[in-house]
């Protein structure tokens, strides 16, 4: 209420300090004195107030708040006074005082010039009485706001201008607050004082005073003040990002109660330098709260402006802060990552699913979500974008797919995208369960074949199981023998014998209504046992089950009414009602209508008790001695157990009246020839039906041979009539009403001799016809057997059909899925490698096959698209054969198979890197040396291959195997199978020279493989070098032994009118007699040896494949020794080519012989392959050489040897065995000149066409030189082939360096030539060699 007015007294205070140094130094002072004594003074308005203050120190005046210091009516004068002018005096003059000048006036020492212990001020309250203004402040129109706090003192400041005025306090509208001196008190200086304010004082309060008959009022509005801060927020929300140079604006918003006031301030990194401008405002538009805003703004933000910004809010004792983080970037950026995994899963039916990414970007990019390449929000209204997330509402299976988020900041030209895959898992749903609406279960006829189907949809694909629940019977009266389900259940499979006999359980994928669904079918072979089948489908989301009540019935439609026969008056009426006991109960007979059409509807008391059988309940109705009145409509009534409905089955019963017998036609006399036949008819009617009896000559006729009685005895048939059959025949018809008869005489004509002749003729005819049909049947069977044998004999693999035909054997072979089945998900298919008769071979990567933890490259054989059932069966048969054969190192082995439903049939086999042996040997002709020593000194030389051969050198899979190519599959590549790309592997092995021990090793391994196949009773039938594959470590494997293919359907073997056969490799008995056996494979093995030791040469070079070739082969002609075969090897070939199959060696004997050639005294310890690296080296103590032979030896049938050694003394054998002396062998080189033409069959490696003599003769016209040897062919008296056979072959010998080079004929006299040992490559059977000089 007072204010200090001290500006004018400052000079006086300084002067006082100079004069009265003692007082200013802090000596004791008296308080100031006022000229008016007492605590108050009353004066009239318009008078002048003089108030003087005297003190010992400088002082100032404090005025009422209603008095302004700038008021012109107010003045203060100061002077020195007292004794020696040592005191300070000041006079306050107020001219023309008014009511608002009422208040407390005080004189107060200045703080610096007084002692704190003394009284510092003197005050007096001045009332300026004004009858027209009893209140100092008048608030009659607009109440003045008075803040209050509940529980504290409340002052209503209605101060008056005179202490004698009486004032009353009223609260709107009608309450009066009377002072009681305790809670409510009146003070003319302060107003009304309420000691402990409550919510009752809240409102409009009015002070009233009556002066001179006039009522004066002043109003106050109490306001309850609070300190409630409801909320503090900073926008934009944290973190706040800006680019350098932008304007930072932060808005701190405080929400409070209506009666709350706040103080707001900021703390931020640039506060010390006042980087920000701050402005505040209040929003009172909300009737329930106040909203205060404090806006901080920084222009051109810099890196130094980043940091923590804090908004501080204070209201009374309440204090709140809110922080936000500000980041300042030099340029924009976008970073997006998967929040979880790239593949997300959800469940169909979920209310919503959120697809979100971890996005860090500035400034905020534009966001677009795509589903399968289409904007998601356009695709469905269920999709909505929130921030960087896509919300999918009411998830369905159609929501599965690829979702891509597109982020773009155009001004920064920044764009990013990221794709996530959403898998919507669906709980299994059974289609039949949703569409089935039958009120009661169906019934299945006894003994019938039933097919139960369960169509299931779910993601992932559900597993379906069939269960059987046997019946548990309830023998209560209400539900007699009713079958109800039990908790006992049995899982079924195709071999289950629980309940009904199961024919099979199949499962397949079908597209139904555009959706892939799994259809499982249970086939019940014989319906006999009632119970319940359950189809249970489950996946990781859930399980669903469909119960199929399987009620067997022996009653048609489960309800049948039958009448035993139409009753006749006096007989018994028998009605039978049979119902299924699983569907009906409460069976009774009722009579619905009588014969006179009188409607009845009552039960029949004559019905018997119902009887229960295995499947039905029978209720019989028997009425004895029926009369015509018993006719009517009878009905059997039964109640359906499931629906409660009463079912009626009606039958009409008409009781017939008795009627005497009546013959429709009388018998008549007639004649019949002996040995003939005759028929007598006796048709009669009556009620009941008459019984007919036949008599001959009054003797009753019984049925016997030659005499046949027809139905109801109404017809008498006599066969082969004899003389004894002549006589009187009589028929009698009888029933309860009477008897009727008719008779006739039968006359027999002719004698018995004629009859015997006819009988003999008939017998002979029957015997002749029987013999004819027997011969015809045998002939047809022979034709069928021949056709079957031809078809069976040409299967690539033949399992000795000693007792059972091949097709039946293959059908009986088992397939062990637990051993061979491989998951398709762990198989990654690659490129196609080839196609066969009914299938194709593709390259694949298999993880974990044969329990390996690594990835292995394999070959997969599968059917072509659109394969037939027979082709599927053929491939399945091949798979069974491969599983039956088993594993061996020297065969291409089966690794696994994929046979389960839901995908194609796949057969997984090994692959071999280096292709077939034939092409490999051809490529090694320039790299061949006899032993390892020469090979170690051979200089590397790049092979020069023929263009067509180069193509063959690429690693490939022949028939069932393939080359490997690395395919990234996410697995570790199996180093034992594949170290590098196939081409690199071949380039490495191509640099290695080929030695004699390699050739023997190949021969030995093939023999071991064939020994294994023969032990498994398998016949290869097409053993050749092209069907031998080369794998790692010089291991060879036999292939093409497991393909169950019919060569008549193979384009490589079949031509209409001609028959393609691999004649060069076939044994004579196979060519002429179509007989295939292990011995015929031995013959083919001999041809294979010839291929190996000619380094891939074509068998029978220069020989035309025609009928003449076959004839000479049958006569004993054989191939000459190949270029690099020793006598021991050639002897083995001749043994394999023995004319008598029984004299040919077994494969076990061949293994032993070749093993002896490989290594002396080797203990094999069960190994399938003998390592050869340490054999035939210098350090082994053996020097492998081919012995020289005398000229006489070659005169005995051998051509010039290709092996010579420098000294015969150095020749030794490696575990050589003693051969029988070679007999004179005719070879195809001795053919007449007209029989052959030079090199015309060199290209026919795989098969030859056996045709008529008009077969074209193939010639090879390429003349590319292979070597520098040139010998002029000038012999005209011999054929080209004979000329070649008489030429001395190029020398082949050992050298220290191992080089191979041709020998020029003109250098034979060179003395230096003998010192340098050298060798020449074998002839290339794919090109013509020209000789420039005649033979010596």
UniProtKB/Swiss-Prot annotation:
GO cellular component term of the entry, any: plasma membrane
Transmembrane feature ranges: 759-780
Compositionally biased residues, Low complexity: 959-969
Domain Ig-like C2-type: 32-121, 151-214, 230-327, 335-421, 429-549, 556-655, 661-747
Post-translational events: N-glycosylated.
Recorded superkingdom: Eukaryota
UniProt modified residues of type Phosphotyrosine: 914, 1053, 1169, 1213, 1242, 1325, 1331
Domain Protein kinase: 827-1158
Control of this protein's activity: Present in an inactive conformation in the absence of bound ligand. Binding of VEGFA, VEGFB or PGF leads to dimerization and activation by autophosphorylation on tyrosine residues.
UniProt subcellular location: Cell membrane; Endosome
Residue numbers binding ATP: 833-841, 861
Keyword Membrane: yes
Cross-referenced InterPro entries: Ig-like_dom (IPR007110), Ig-like_dom_sf (IPR036179), Ig-like_fold (IPR013783), Ig_I-set (IPR013098), Ig_sub (IPR003599), Ig_sub2 (IPR003598), Kinase-like_dom_sf (IPR011009), Prot_kinase_dom (IPR000719)
Topology with respect to the bilayer: Single-pass type I membrane protein
Record-linked CDD domains: Ig
EC number: 2.7.10.1
Region Disordered, annotated ranges: 941-982, 1304-1326
Reported function: Tyrosine-protein kinase that acts as a cell-surface receptor for VEGFA, VEGFB and PGF, and plays an essential role in the development of embryonic vasculature, the regulation of angiogenesis, cell survival, cell migration, macrophage function, chemotaxis, and cancer cell invasion. Acts as a positive regulator of postnatal retinal hyaloid vessel regression. May play an essential role as a negative regulator of embryonic angiogenesis by inhibiting excessive proliferation of endothelial cells. Can promote endothelial cell proliferation, survival and angiogenesis in adulthood.
Domain remarks in the Swiss-Prot or TrEMBL record: The second and third Ig-like C2-type (immunoglobulin-like) domains are sufficient for VEGFA binding.
Assembly information from the UniProt record: Interacts with VEGFA, VEGFB and PGF. Monomer in the absence of bound VEGFA, VEGFB or PGF. Homodimer in the presence of bound VEGFA, VEGFB and PGF. Can also form a heterodimer with KDR. Interacts (tyrosine phosphorylated) with CBL, CRK, GRB2, NCK1, PIK3R1, PLCG, PSEN1 and PTPN11. Probably interacts with PTPRB. Interacts with RACK1. Identified in a complex with CBL and CD2AP.
Protein name per its UniProtKB record: Vascular endothelial growth factor receptor 1
Species this protein is from: Rattus norvegicus
């Amino acid at each position: 209420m007072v204010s200090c007015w001290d500006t004018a007294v400052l000079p006086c205070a300084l002067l006082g300090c100079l004069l009265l140094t003692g007082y200013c130094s802090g000596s004791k002072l008296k308080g100031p004195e006022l000229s008016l004594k007492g605590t108050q003074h009353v004066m009239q308005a318009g008078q002048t107030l003089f108030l003087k203050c005297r003190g010992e120190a400088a002082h100032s005046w404090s005025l009422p708040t209603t008095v302004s210091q700038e008021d012109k009516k107010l003045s203060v004068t100061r002077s020195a006074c007292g004794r020696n002018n040592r005191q300070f005096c000041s006079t306050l003059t107020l001219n023309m005082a008014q009511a608002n000048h009422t208040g407390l006036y005080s004189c107060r020492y200045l703080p610096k010039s007084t002692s704190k212990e003394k009284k510092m001020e003197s005050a007096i309250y001045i009332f300026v009485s004004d009858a027209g203004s009893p209140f100092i402040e008048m608030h009659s129109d607009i109440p003045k706001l008075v803040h209050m706090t509940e529980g504290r003192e409340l002052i209503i400041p209605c101060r008056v201008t005179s202490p004698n005025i009486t004032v009353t306090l009223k609260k709107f509208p009608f309450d009066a607050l009377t002072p009681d001196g305790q809670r409510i008190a009146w003070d003319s200086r302060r107003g009304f004082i309420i000691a402990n304010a409550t919510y009752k004082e809240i409102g409009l309060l009015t002070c009233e005073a009556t002066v001179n008959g006039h009522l004066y009022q002043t109003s106050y509005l109490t306001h309850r003040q609070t300190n409630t801060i409801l909320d503090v927020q900073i926008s934009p929300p944290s973190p706040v990002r800006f680019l350098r140079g932008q304007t930072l604006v932060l808005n701190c918003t405080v929400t409070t109660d209506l009666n709350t006031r706040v103080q707001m301030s900021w703390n931020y990194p640039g506060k010390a330098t006042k980087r920000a401008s701050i402005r505040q405002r209040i929003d009172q538009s909300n009737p329930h709260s106040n909203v205060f805003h404090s806006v901080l703004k920084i222009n051109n933000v810099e890196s130094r402006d980043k940091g923590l910004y804090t908004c501080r809010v204070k209201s009374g004792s309440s204090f709140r802060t809110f922080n936000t983080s500000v980041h300042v970037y030099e340029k924009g950026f976008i970073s997006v990552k998967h929040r979880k995994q790239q593949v997300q899963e959800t469940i169909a039916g979920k209310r919503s699913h959120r697809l979100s990414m971890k996005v860090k970007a500035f400034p905020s990019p534009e966001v677009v979500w795509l589903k399968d390449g289409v904007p998601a929000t356009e695709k469905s209204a269920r999709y909505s974008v929130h921030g960087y997330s896509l919300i999918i509402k009411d998830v369905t299976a159609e929501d599965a797919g690829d979702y891509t988020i597109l982020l773009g900041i155009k001004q920064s030209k920044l764009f990013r995208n990221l794709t996530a895959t959403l898998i919507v898992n669906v709980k299994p749903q059974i289609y039949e369960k949703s569409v089935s609406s039958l009120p009661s279960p169906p019934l299945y006829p006894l003994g019938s074949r039933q097919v139960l189907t369960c169509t299931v949809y779910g993601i992932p694909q559900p597993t379906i199981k069939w269960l059987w629940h046997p019946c548990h019977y309830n023998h209560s009266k209400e539900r007699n023998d009713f079958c109800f389900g039990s908790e006992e259940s049995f899982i079924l499979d195709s071999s289950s014998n629980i309940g009904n006999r199961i024919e099979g359980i199949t499962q397949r994928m079908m597209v139904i209504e555009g959706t892939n669904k799994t259809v499982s079918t249970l086939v019940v072979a014989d319906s006999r046992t009632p119970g319940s089948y359950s189809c249970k489908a489950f996946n990781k989301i859930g399980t669903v089950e469909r119960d199929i009540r399987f009620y067997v019935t022996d009653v048609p439609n489960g309800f049948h009414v039958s009448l035993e026969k139409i009753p006749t008056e006096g007989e018994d009426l028998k009605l039978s009602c049979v119902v299924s006991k699983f569907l009906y109960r409460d069976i009774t007979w009722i009579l619905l209508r009588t014969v006179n059409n009188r409607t009845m509807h009552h039960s029949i008391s004559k019905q018997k008790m119902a009887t229960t059988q295995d499947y039905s309940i029978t209720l019989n109705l028997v009425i004895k001695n029926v009369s015509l009145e018993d006719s009517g409509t009878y009905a059997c009534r039964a109640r359906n157990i499931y629906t409660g409905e009463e079912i009626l089955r009606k039958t009409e019963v008409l009781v017939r009246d008795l009627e005497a017998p009546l013959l429709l036609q009388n018998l008549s006399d007639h004649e019949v020839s002996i040995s003939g036949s005759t028929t007598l008819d006796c048709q009669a009617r009556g009620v009941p039906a008459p019984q007919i009896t036949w008599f001959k000559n009054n003797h009753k006729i019984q049925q016997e041979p030659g005499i046949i009685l027809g139905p109801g005895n109404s017809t008498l048939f006599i066969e082969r009539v004899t003389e004894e059959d002549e006589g009187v025949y009589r028929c009698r018809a009888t029933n309860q009403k009477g008897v009727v008869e008719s008779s006739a005489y039968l006359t027999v004509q002719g004698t018995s001799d004629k009859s015997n002749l006819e009988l003999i003729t008939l017998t002979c005819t029957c015997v002749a016809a029987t013999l004819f049909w027997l011969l015809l049947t045998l002939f047809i069977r022979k034709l069928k057997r021949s056709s079957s044998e031809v078809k069976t004999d040409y299967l690539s693999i033949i399992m000795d059909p000693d007792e059972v035909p091949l097709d039946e054997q293959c059908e009986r072979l088992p397939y062990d899925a637990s051993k061979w089945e491989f998951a398709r998900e762990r198989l990654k298919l690659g490129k196609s490698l080839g196609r066969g008769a009914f299938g194709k071979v593709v390259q694949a990567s298999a993880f974990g096959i044969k329990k390996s933890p690594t990835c292995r490259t394999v070959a997969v054989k599968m059917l072509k698209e659109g394969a037939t059932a027979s082709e599927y069966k053929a491939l399945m048969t091949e798979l069974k054969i491969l599983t039956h054969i088993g594993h061996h190192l020297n065969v291409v082995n089966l690794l696994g198979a994929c046979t389960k439903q839901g995908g194609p049939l796949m057969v997984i086999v090994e692959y071999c890197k280096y292709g077939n042996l034939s092409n490999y040997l051809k490529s090694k002709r320039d790299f061949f040396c006899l032993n390892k020593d020469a090979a170690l000194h051979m200089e590397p030389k790049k092979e020069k291959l023929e263009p067509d051969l180069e193509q063959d050198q690429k690693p490939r899979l022949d028939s069932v195997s393939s080359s490997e190519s690395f395919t990234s599959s996410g697995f570790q590549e199996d180093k034992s199978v594949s170290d590098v790309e196939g081409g690199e592997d071949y380039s490495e092995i191509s640099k290695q020279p080929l030695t004699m021990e390699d050739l023997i090793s190949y021969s030995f391994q093939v023999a071991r493989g064939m020994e294994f196949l023969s032990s498994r009773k398998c016949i290869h039938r097409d053993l050749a070098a092209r069907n031998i594959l080369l794998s790692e470590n010089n291991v060879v494997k036999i292939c093409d032994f497991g393909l169950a293919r019919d060569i008549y359907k193979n384009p490589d073997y079949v031509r209409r009118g001609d028959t393609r056969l691999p004649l060069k490799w076939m044994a004579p008995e196979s060519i002429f007699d179509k007989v295939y056996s292990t011995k015929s494979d031995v013959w083919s093995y001999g041809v294979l040896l010839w291929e190996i030791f000619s380094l891939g040469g074509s068998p029978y070079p220069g020989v035309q494949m025609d009928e003449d070739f076959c004839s000479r082969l049958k006569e004993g002609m054989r191939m000459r020794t190949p270029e690099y075969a020793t006598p021991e090897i050639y002897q083995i070939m001749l043994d394999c080519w023995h004319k008598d199959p029984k004299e040919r060696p077994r494969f076990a004997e061949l293994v032993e012989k070749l093993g002896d050639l490989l290594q002396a005294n080797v203990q094999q310890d069960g190994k399938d392959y003998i390592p050869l690296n340490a054999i035939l080296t210098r350090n082994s103590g053996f020097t492998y050489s081919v012995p020289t032979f005398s000229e006489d030896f070659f005169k005995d049938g051998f051509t010039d040897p290709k092996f010579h050694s420098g000294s015969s003394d150095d020749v030794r054998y490696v575990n050589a065995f003693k051969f029988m002396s070679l007999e004179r062998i005719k070879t195809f080189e001795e053919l007449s000149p007209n029989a052959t033409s030079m090199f015309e069959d060199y290209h026919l490696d795989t098969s030859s066409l056996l045709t008529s003599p008009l077969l074209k003769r193939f010639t090879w016209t390429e003349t590319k030189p292979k070597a520098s040897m040139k010998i002029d062919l000038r012999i005209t008296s011999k054929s080209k082939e004979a000329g070649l056979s008489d030429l001395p072959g190029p020398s082949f010998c050992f050298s220290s360096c191992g080089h191979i080079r041709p020998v020029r004929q003109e250098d034979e006299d060179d003395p230096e030539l003998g010192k340098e040992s050298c060798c020449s490559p074998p002839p290339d059977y794919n090109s013509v060699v020209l000789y420039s000089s005649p033979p010596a």
